[in-house]
Amino acid sequence: MNALLEQKEQQERLREAAALGDIREVQKLVESGVDVNSQNEVNGWTCLHWACKRNHGQVVSYLLKSGADKEILTTKGEMPVQLTSRREIRKIMGVEEEDDDDDDDDNLPQLKKESELPFVPNYLANPAFPFIYTPTAEDSAQMQNGGPSTPPASPPADGSPPLLPPGEPPLLGTFPRDHTSLALVQNGDVSAPSAILRTPESTKPGPVCQPPVSQSRSLFSSVPSKPPMSLEPQNGTYAGPAPAFQPFFFTGAFPFNMQELVLKVRIQNPSLRENDFIEIELDRQELTYQELLRVCCCELGVNPDQVEKIRKLPNTLLRKDKDVARLQDFQELELVLMISENNFLFRNAASTLTERPCYNRRASKLTY
């Protein structure tokens, strides 16, 4: 049972490869012993029917040499030769045309009745595959003779200049109309010779003005700047233009030195009316809790033993090195000190009137 299912699967793969024009897959399946005259159970089509339907002349020639029957009928009574729209395939099938004057009939499909099938196969509903290349008659002859086959260079349909043929040095020219390719070349993601199109011979590369790059670029972009590329020929090729300047926009104040983390620190003391922050710098390579505590105490003139905790405003407690590593530039921190009688900050600070123990709120509201 499994062998029968595998055999049907191989036959279906052969019909699909013939419909796609994949001559290598067709040869591989035929050489492995797949029946070239096997028919689909629904519509009765063989691999030769599909090759004629899609006008793959090379596949048709190979199937006929492999013993494909060109007289097999489908469930609608169609022979393979009736499904093709090209005269060269009809000649391969052995059908001679009486009227050979008009060459425009080669690409005219024959009118056929609409399919009566309840469904449309996937390879029929989506016939175009961009990676499938249909060889021409010359390529067919080269493949049969054992020579290499290369796709011929054809000009683009939109009127743009043709791409560089292999073996010729790329010339400096205009970029394609697609701005995405231009952006990729300017950003350095794609090499310039592969994205530049060839220009007519009368066009010569002229001087290109390079915009001056100021020293402030290091403040806007963390990406190291690339040296400008020269337009002089190097080993017979022209290098592309210099990458475009793309500033890095930062929401908020931007630190001057990227190696340092700038923080705002103060001592928590609600008794003082003016309790300003000071800025400290930490090395980004040493973002640890002990280093933060050491720098804060050194800058504020506080003994580390007096620090009870470090608070990230408004209400987050810093406890370990990972908390310090998550800090951003210009975040506000507060050192909470232990309250004691020997604390010079709290001893000298003048408490407000409402915090004194002898303050009477009811008496303050009386009117005399």
Swiss-Prot record:
Alphabetical keyword list: Acetylation, ANK repeat, Repeat
The keyword Acetylation is assigned to this record: yes
Intervals holding ANK repeats: 9-38, 43-72
Biased composition range(s): Pro residues: 149-169
Disordered: annotated span: 93-115, 139-176, 196-238
N-acetylmethionine modified-residue sites: 1
Composition skew (Acidic residues), residue ranges: 95-107
Biased amino acid composition, Polar residues: 212-224
Signal peptide segment: none
A Pfam family it matches: Ank_4
Name of the protein: Ankyrin repeat domain-containing protein 40
Protein species of origin: Homo sapiens
Classification lineage: Eukaryota, Metazoa, Chordata, Craniata, Vertebrata
